[in-house]
Amino acid sequence: MTDSLTHTSPFLVAALYHFVSVPRFENLQALLQTLCEQSGVKGTLLLAHEGINGTIAGPDAGIAAVLSFLRAQPEFSGLEHKESRASKMPFLRMKVKLKKEIVTMGVEDIDPNKVVGTYVAPQEWNALISDPDTIVIDTRNDYETAIGTFRGALDPKTKTFREFPDWVRSNSGLHNKPKIAMYCTGGIRCEKATAFMKAEGFDEVYHLKGGILKYLEEVPQEESLWDGACFVFDERVSVEHGLKEGEHRLCHACRNPITAEEITSPLYEEGVSCSHCYDTRTEEDRLRYRQRQHQIALARKRGQRHIGS
C-alpha cells in the first residue's frame, strides 16, 4: 500500500468485484444491508447470479467487518478488493441491489465464470501495451476517458457499457494485430469484455488485473504510462497516482467531471450547467436545477445534507 493510503484520511474506501456463480444471491441482500448500516458503511453493492460488484466506504473496522462477512460465504472466499482513502464520506447512503448482471453489457450467454482473458499484473502492463503487436482498448465510457487514459489506447467513446459490443463488431481492424489488451477502472468491465472478445473469436486477449486503480497504486509515477486522472464513481470524482484524491469536481447537471479551468467558464454555474452540457439543456432545465441548488444551500445552513448534493 502506498504512503498516500495512510490514516490521515478517516474513511477507508474498498472497491470490489468477484465473478462467481451465486445461486441464492437474494438471501444476502438484507444481511449485507443490515451489517453495513450497523458498521457505519455506505456505498453500493450489486448482487446477481454472476457475482458481486461495488464500492463501499466507512471506518476501517466497519469495512473489515463487511469484507470478513463476504469472505465467510463459500462463493466469495476468494474475493479481492482495492483500498484507497477519502477525506470525507464519499457516499450518501448504503444500497444493496439485486441485478440481472453485476456489470451490464446486455449480451446473452457471456459468462466470465467460464471463459475470460488472461490477467496481466500492473508491473507487467507497460511491456504489454508497448508491444507493437498489441491493440490497447479502454472499455470505459467517454466521460471517464476524457480526464485520463493510457498512452496509445483506443477510446470507443461509448456512453454506456452496452454500446461496447457494437463498437467491437463495427471495427474489423481490431483483428489486424494478434494481441488485445483491455482495461477499466477496477477490472470488472474489462474482465467481462474479455469474455465477450473471446466469444467473438479473438484469441490473445489480456486485461489489467485490478484495473487502473491497482496500477496507480502499485506503479511509480516516474514509470507510469498513464496520463491524467482516473474517474471514480463517488464524491472524490477522480484519483491520481498513488490513489491521491484528484482535483476534478462533478457537474451535478450532467454528471461530467470538470476541471478547475472549466469552473471559470462563463457557462459554468454550480449544480446548473457547465461547458459540457450548457447547449444540451433548456432554460426550464436550468430553472429546475437552480431550485435544487437552493434546496441544497438551505440544507447546508441547517447542517444537513441534501439528497441531491
Curated annotation (Swiss-Prot):
It holds the Pfam family UPF0176_N. The keyword tRNA processing applies. It catalyses: uridine(34) in tRNA + AH2 + O2 = 5-hydroxyuridine(34) in tRNA + A + H2O. Keywords: Oxidoreductase, tRNA processing. Residues 130-224 form the Rhodanese domain. It is an enzyme of class 1 (oxidoreductase). Gene3D superfamilies: 3.30.70.100, Rhodanese-like domain. The active site is at 184 (cysteine persulfide intermediate). The keyword tRNA processing applies. Its EC number is 1.14.-.-. GO terms for biological process: tRNA modification. It comes from the Bacteria. SMART domains: RHOD. GO terms for molecular function: oxidoreductase activity, acting on paired donors, with incorporation or reduction of molecular oxygen. InterPro entries: Rhodanese-like_dom, Rhodanese-like_dom_sf, TrhO, TRHO_N. Catalyzes oxygen-dependent 5-hydroxyuridine (ho5U) modification at position 34 in tRNAs. Belongs to the TrhO family. PANTHER family: RHODANESE-LIKE DOMAIN-CONTAINING PROTEIN 7-RELATED (PTHR43268:SF3), THIOSULFATE SULFURTRANSFERASE/RHODANESE-LIKE DOMAIN-CONTAINING PROTEIN 2 (PTHR43268). This is tRNA uridine(34) hydroxylase. It comes from Rhizobium leguminosarum bv. trifolii (strain WSM2304).
